[in-house]
Amino acid sequence: ALRIRWQAAQQARLAEHLGQELTEMEWLSRSARQLPQHDLAREKIIIRQQMEQLQTELAGYGQLSRGLAHYALGRGHMALHEYPPALTELQQAIQLEVQGAEVHYALGFVLGKHFEQAMYEARLSGGGDWARKQLKDIEPKYLTPAIASLARSRSMRLDAPQYLEGLIAYYQRDYDVALKQADAALRLAPIDQHGDCIGE
């Protein structure tokens, strides 16, 4: 019982530290993207260095931190808008039983970005019937799990919970609700949760 309590306390401290580091990475990414258009290479290098440092730190905790390390890397890739590696890392975190609203929010967000990219590519490749067939293939792979993960993240504390509701409505193709929620989110928190507007 003592060992289990010690592990739980260690994991809680680790998660708190991780949260602070992730907030710093995401703030840097968001701030850089809000500046006048410029080369983001410098900021990307800083974020990658932070990711490497975090990975090294987490490795020192051994088995206890494996899932958290994947989660941290997933969020780092997410901050860099590198969605394929973000998806891989977040899925590995969940397989290692890292749960919680924040993990599901990140996974849902990234799956949604994959869906948008796949739709864009389907339209470029032919449109019409071919794009509709592609949609049937990619919906269960990306869209359905994106909506499910976002819905599981509703307990997460956000500055503007309407952003999450708008994102879910957008992926459910309820565009009127999505726009209303996006408008409400912008009034509450002028800068949204990830520097992305619904539908971008």
Give, region by region, the residue ranges found by the protein language model.
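C-terminal luminal/periplasmic domains and tails of membrane-associated envelope-modifying transferases
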Residues: 130-199
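Short intrinsically disordered, low-complexity coil segments enriched in acidic
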Residues: 1-12, 17, 104, 175-179, ...
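Charged/polar helix/coil "stalk" or linker segments at domain boundaries
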Residues: 1-147, 155-162
